[in-house]
């Protein structure tokens, strides 16, 4: 395990932050793919926190941000629950849901970790703002909110932002960036390992560098893993597929190295969309990846 003994599973069946519906069914698909059986085989003590209550759909609108009020309510409640889990000295394992739930996850973590390292495994940087976002979908702004880039009502969720520091953040698997995101990454000091970097350096060297960055002067390390970081041939069940992603073995190897480091203190897996999947392939893959993070070995 990492720095705690018990894993607390928290399902967040929420998909309002994404451009298409279906990721709200992700947690159940992951459970249906055998998550509890896999964790039992690893002999890991698990506390199932059950699904977080998802807000009703409001009629209110925001001129640029879709489902703004629902996302505020959801992430406020999620932050409180994650904080409660950490206070019990348990390992929060959050299952999404779309990537907008990261806002609540790290808002809860920030109430306990004042210098949090973040590994953001994603095809995208999720650093857009309401002004730069082409779509208005908040799942593309979730990391930006933690850096104070975003509407006050989002960044001011208790602990939400700015509670992350650019120098403590590593992006891995990136292969689609909007112009404003490129500019911010270059100017802010965030370390970004694109697919080009992974191809050139290999995942072993990338992870060595990444772990060095996120553990330098930090008091905890959070993994935010978007399943669209993988190549769509491996993980078809996700809403924003970008060709040329992380391979099956590269992903497993990265998570195995994170386990070996014993430095990861929390994790979330997001953007599994069973309505776009092929026979629950992506959910099964997610179960396997979670197992690698928590100690599954070939031998």
What are these regions (language model features)?
Residues 14, 98-99, 123, 174-175, ...:
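Active-site metal-binding loops of divalent metal-dependent hydrolases
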Residues 91-156, 261-262:
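Active-site histidine-anchored catalytic micro-motif
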Residues 2-3, 111-113, 135-137, 158-164, ...:
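Solvent-exposed alpha-helices and their adjacent loops that cap or buttress functional pockets
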Residues 150-154, 172-178, 205-206, 247-252:
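A general structural motif
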Residues 120-123, 147, 168, 173-176, ...:
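Short, structured patches in soluble enzyme cores that scaffold and shape functional sites
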Residues 166-168, 175-180, 217-221:
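Aromatic-lined glycan-binding groove of carbohydrate-active enzymes
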Residues 90-92, 166-170:
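Short active-site oxyanion
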Residues 4-14, 20-93, 105, 111, ...:
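Catalytic cores of soluble, metal-dependent hydrolases
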